[in-house]
């Protein structure tokens, strides 16, 4: 509720807001002295202190994010108050996007927090979408190994919120979205063989991108047809996942018209995992209001 912002202020108003031990005296209530948080800048840290210094003082640190931001580290946002037991409140305004440019988090409840934090999200918190991290399916050489290796997997999507410290309550009336996983690469086509020798099949396609902050979801690229003697086509890359969804496995390569002995088409790569809306990275949390949208586990 806070101390009155005008009119008469008594020691009882201050005790009601900040607590303390009897007998009460104003010297208990210096700013950053353990009872009064640093956001109450009118309250001195030492020296003369008077009742009127406490007009509008509140026993919590409130930060509001009203503009877009990326990779928000709450220990930096709250500064020295992060390691204080003073309650903390983070408000994210409607229409504000908090995004991830790395695969770790868009917003992180950092290590070392003391006390509690209440996160009130009315905006949109978006994890990073996955990218293909391995090769599309291919044959290492024109002749040699009969069966190509499995195509590379798609990268995982990143979480929207990472929880490292306990004591967080998350109220969501907006949207919290983990990144989508990338699609796996398409498998290489089966080797062919004719009287002229063995011939490699076509390369597989690349996996698609997962949906994420500043990244649209894409489908995989098509597999290629290679040597005329093989007449086998590489498999298509798997499409990336939407926000909070896994990428798809790439397609297996096609069969050759004239198959080389003991040869098989290459397998498609696995799709990347979905990013969590809220992820336990060492600590649990409490879901408060959940009337908003979640894309990914929470």
Question: What feature does the model see in each segment?
Answer:
Residues 2-298:
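Glycine-centric low-complexity repeats
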């Amino acid at each position: 509720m806070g101390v009155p912002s005008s009119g008469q202020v008594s020691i009882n108003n201050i005790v009601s807001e900040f607590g303390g031990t009897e007998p009460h005296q104003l010297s208990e209530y210096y700013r950053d002295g353990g009872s009064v948080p640093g956001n109450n800048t009118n309250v001195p840290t030492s020296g003369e202190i008077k009742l009127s210094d406490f007009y509008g003082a509140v026993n919590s640190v409130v930060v509001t994010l009203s503009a877009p931001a990326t990779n928000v580290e709450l220990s930096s946002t709250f500064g020295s108050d992060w390691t204080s037991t003073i309650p903390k409140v983070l408000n994210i305004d409607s229409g504000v996007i908090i995004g991830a440019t790395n695969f770790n988090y868009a917003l992180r409840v950092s290590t070392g927090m003391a006390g509690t934090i209440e996160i009130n999200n009315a905006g949109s918190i978006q994890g990073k979408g996955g990218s293909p991290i391995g090769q599309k399916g291919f044959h290492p050489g024109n002749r040699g190994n009969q069966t190509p290796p499995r195509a590379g997997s798609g990268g995982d999507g990143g979480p929207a919120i990472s929880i490292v410290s306990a004591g967080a309550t998350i109220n969501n009336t907006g949207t919290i979205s983990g990144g989508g996983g990338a699609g796996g690469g398409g498998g290489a086509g089966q080797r062919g063989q004719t009287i002229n020798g063995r011939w490699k099949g076509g390369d597989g396609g690349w996996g698609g991108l997962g949906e994420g902050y500043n990244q649209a979801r894409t489908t995989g690229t098509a597999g290629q047809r290679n040597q005329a003697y093989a007449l086998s086509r590489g498999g298509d890359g798997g499409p990336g996942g939407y926000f909070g969804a896994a990428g798809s496995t790439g397609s297996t390569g096609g069969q050759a018209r004239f198959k080389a002995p003991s040869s098989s088409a290459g397998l498609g790569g696995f799709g990347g995992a979905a990013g969590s809306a809220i992820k336990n990275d060492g600590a649990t949390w409490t879901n408060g209001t959940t009337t908003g949208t979640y894309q990914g586990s929470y």
